[in-house]
Regions:
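Aromatic- and glycine-rich beta-strand/loop motifs that create alpha-glucan
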Residues: 1-28, 238-242
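Hydrophobic alpha-helical transmembrane segments of multi-pass membrane transport/permease proteins
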Residues: 15-42, 52-68, 160-172, 213-224
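A structural motif at transmembrane helix-loop-helix junctions in multipass membrane proteins
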Residues: 20, 134-171
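Short alpha-helical transmembrane interface motifs in multi-pass membrane proteins
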Residues: 21, 54, 62-67, 97-98, ...
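Hydrophobic alpha-helical transmembrane segments of multi-pass membrane transport proteins
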Residues: 49-87, 91-114
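Alpha-helical transmembrane segments and their short interhelical loops
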Residues: 92, 100-152
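Terminal transmembrane helical anchor/hairpin motif
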Residues: 172-219
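Junction motif at the cytosolic side of a transmembrane helix
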Residues: 215-242
């Protein structure tokens, strides 16, 4: 299984880097970061504070990670590539985990490089920042896997990706100006990252409520993914039987 998984990971990595549209989606967060930095410099506004990261990191993850995952899964389902892989002996676990691993690799690139582009005061070695943003990236990845599995065609995938991107990108920003949005964020998968942005010097131990909320979200998303996989396995079995 290890060799098969390693081969799938390599194939996924090649797909991310060879497909021009997917590669552009991955690179676009860094382009946006440079653009915003230039735009703010014209207005003599600093991009070094953590508040700016509070918008740009979720936005970058939704554009650079969420959209490619949904696009890949929806395209493979439309072309019945998933069924072909299952019939050839590839397990659902291997299929999804390979996509998740490659996606999280690029997510970590976003988490590390974006603060460097912005000359942010937030150090990439800051445990609170790295921990909270990584947990958010895992949640975004799982949500995207679920959305991609539910999309039977590329058109449906594009439609589903819009609310996923909108919620991930703009909810943290709206939380700063609207109490209802703030309450939603406090109980969402963005909760821990949002708390860090609000209080960068606060230890994670004092954010135990947000940590528990994020862990519950991850557990819920993994459970939903598992249930969808079980349904697909049943459908594939019925297809073979007939």
């Amino acid at each position: 299984m290890t060799k098969k998984l390693a081969a799938l990971i390599w194939l996924r990595f090649k797909l991310f880097t060879v497909n021009k549209s997917i590669l552009f989606e991955i690179v676009s967060p860094f382009i946006f970061a440079y653009f915003y930095k230039y735009l703010y410099s014209l207005q003599k506004i600093s991009t070094q504070n953590s508040d700016f990261l509070g918008f740009l990191i979720p936005f970058s993850l939704s554009i650079g990670i969420s959209i490619p995952i949904i696009a890949i899964l929806s395209e493979e389902q439309e072309k019945n590539s998933l069924s072909a892989l299952m019939l050839s002996g590839v397990h659902y676990f291997e299929y999804l985990i390979s996509l998740a691993i490659v996606s999280l690799f690029f997510a970590l690139c976003i988490i590390i490089i974006i603060p460097l582009i912005l000359n942010s005061k937030v150090s990439i070695l800051n445990f609170n920042y790295f921990f909270s943003s990584t947990f958010m990236a895992i949640s975004v990845c799982l949500i995207s896997l679920i959305a991609g599995l539910l999309a039977k065609t590329q058109v449906i995938g594009q439609v589903i990706s819009l609310p996923v991107v909108a919620i991930t990108s703009f909810l943290p920003m709206l939380a700063t100006i609207n109490n209802t949005c703030k309450a939603i964020v406090n109980y969402s998968f963005i909760s821990l990252f949002y708390k860090y942005i609000q209080e960068p010097n606060l230890a994670l131990g004092n954010n135990s409520k947000s940590l528990v909320i994020v862990l519950l979200w991850i557990a819920l998303l993994i459970t939903i993914t598992y249930l969808i996989i079980q349904i697909y396995r049943k459908d594939l079995f019925n297809y073979d039987w007939h």
